[in-house]
């Protein structure tokens, strides 16, 4: 479950609130790290990951694979949905995206090692129970791995890097064995810089021929798509956790390294990088080469090629191997992760807290709703005058559960 050789074992009326599904409302999911979270702009879908075992001397354990948690970004409420079908094994370090409310899941690490299986779950389904479907894709797949990144462009999912097994077939790119993995495993693993494309219309794998200077092999890096550019920042390669920034042109497949002006974030892995506008990326948290958890946040301005430190109220809440999703309201929603050195397994402080970063000005509707809620006693008799969709939002917010956690 670690980012390299230290094996931790183990984003009108609001859209449908999933009332039609078999669901349970609970305060919040269990604490976890190494999970996936994706967003349709209004809901954040959380799956997988692992947590510490409360019994001293026992290993960490994976979270139940059937559980899909849905966080309403407007109301701050959680729902748990039990899924069925070709349910993926419980895993950490998988890679996931949400496209048109369809969840795609690839790779990860489970109790028997790494995998390269591909799954999808359609959250638009009319069925009362959401169904996972394992897709048998055409072509040569990526090797079995975890801690990789993904870009979404047109009808393509483009995967980059990761940590896992040597490819069984000949692939384009570099694979570097982790020498220490020979000591504690019969299936040694390593880092790679492979780029693989999955066409979501044909479900066929392919590899592009890239040009330019490719980034070094890496894992636990962070990827973000803006326009036709796939950005990648940081990650771990051997003993170094890096702070280099690159982008891949997703039309021409040319790599470019960016050398930003001024100060830059320190090297890290297990961080998050989230597109928040057509010109900005938002970076939060991570883990340094010196094994220090980070709580700093930065915005990267694409047009100016510069990093700007972002002030926020969570400086005492470092996070690594967390997730981050953008909402339609100009917020970045961070969930879970570890607050200390994840590699000291019996002391790992996994979290189930939601951290909300406002990276864009709030809309007038949002400000008005917050004012109505703030002065609820004074304005309650006038609520019936609100448009139906606004009244729905107000009522949901009053039922909101606390987003704070462990």
UniProtKB/Swiss-Prot annotation:
Autoubiquitinated by the CRL2(KLHDC2) E3 ligase complex. Kelch repeats lie at residues 31-85, 92-136, 148-207, 221-259, 271-311, 322-359. It holds the Pfam family Kelch_KLHDC2_KLHL20_DRC7. Coiled coil: none annotated. Pathway: Protein modification; protein ubiquitination. It is found in: Nucleus. GO terms for molecular function: ubiquitin-like ligase-substrate adaptor activity. Keywords: Kelch repeat, Nucleus, Repeat, Ubl conjugation, Ubl conjugation pathway. GO terms for cellular component: Cul2-RING ubiquitin ligase complex; nucleus. Substrate-recognition component of a Cul2-RING (CRL2) E3 ubiquitin-protein ligase complex of the DesCEND (destruction via C-end degrons) pathway, which recognizes a C-degron located at the extreme C terminus of target proteins, leading to their ubiquitination and degradation. The C-degron recognized by the DesCEND pathway is usually a motif of less than ten residues and can be present in full-length proteins, truncated proteins or proteolytically cleaved forms. Component of a CRL2(KLHDC2) E3 ubiquitin-protein ligase complex, also named ECS(KLHDC2) complex, composed of CUL2, Elongin BC (ELOB and ELOC), RBX1 and substrate-specific adapter KLHDC2. May form oligomers as a KLHDC2-ELOB-ELOC complex; this interaction is autoinhibitory for the E3 ligase complex as the substrate-binding site of KLHDC2 is blocked in the oligomer. Interacts with CREB3; interaction is direct and specific as it does not interact with CREB1, ATF4, ATF6, JUN, FOS, CEBPA or herpes simplex virus transactivator VP16. This is Kelch domain-containing protein 2. It comes from Rattus norvegicus.
């Amino acid at each position: 479950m670690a980012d390299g050789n230290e094996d931790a074992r183990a984003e009108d009326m609001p859209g449908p609130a999933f009332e039609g599904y078999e669901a349970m409302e609970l305060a919040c999911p269990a604490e976890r790290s190494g999970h996936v979270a994706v967003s349709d702009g209004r809901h954040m879908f959380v799956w997988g990951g692992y947590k510490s075992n409360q019994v001293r001397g026992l290993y960490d354990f994976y979270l139940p694979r059937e559980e899909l948690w849905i966080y309403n970004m407007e109301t701050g409420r959680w729902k748990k949905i039990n899924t069925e079908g070709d349910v993926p094994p419980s895993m950490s370090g998988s890679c996931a995206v949400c496209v048109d409310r369809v969840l795609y899941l690839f790779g990860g690490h489970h109790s028997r090692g790494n995998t390269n299986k591909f799954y999808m779950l359609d959250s638009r389904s009319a069925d009362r129970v959401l169904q996972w479907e394992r897709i048998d894709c055409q072509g040569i797949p990526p090797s079995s791995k975890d801690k990789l990144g993904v870009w979404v462009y047109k009808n393509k999912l483009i995967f980059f890097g990761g940590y896992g097994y040597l490819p069984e077939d000949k692939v384009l790119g570099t694979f570097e064995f982790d020498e220490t993995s020979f000591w504690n495993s019969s299936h040694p693993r390593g880092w790679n810089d492979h780029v693989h494309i999955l066409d979501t219309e044909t479900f066929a794998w392919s590899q592009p021929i890239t040009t330019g200077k490719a980034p070094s092999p890496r894992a636990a890096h962070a990827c973000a798509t803006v326009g036709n550019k796939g950005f990648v920042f940081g990650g771990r390669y051997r003993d170094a956790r890096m702070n280099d920034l690159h982008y891949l042109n997703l039309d021409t497949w040319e790599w470019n390294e960016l050398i930003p002006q001024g100060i830059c974030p320190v090297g890290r892995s297990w961080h998050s990088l989230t597109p928040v506008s057509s010109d900005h990326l938002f970076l939060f948290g991570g883990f340094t080469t010196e094994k220090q958890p980070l709580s700093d946040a930065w915005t990267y301005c694409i047009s100016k090629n510069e990093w700007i430190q972002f002030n926020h109220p969570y400086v005492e809440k470092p996070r690594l191997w967390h997730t981050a999703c953008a909402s339609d309201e100009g917020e970045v929603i961070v969930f879970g992760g570890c607050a200390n050195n994840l590699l000291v397994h019996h002391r790992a402080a996994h979290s189930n807290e939601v951290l909300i970063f406002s990276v864009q000005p709030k809309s007038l509707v949002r400000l008005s709703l917050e004012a109505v809620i703030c002065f609820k006693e004074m304005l309650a008799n006038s609520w019936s005058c609100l448009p139906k969709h606004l009244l729905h939002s107000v009522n949901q917010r009053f039922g909101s559960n606390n987003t704070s956690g462990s």
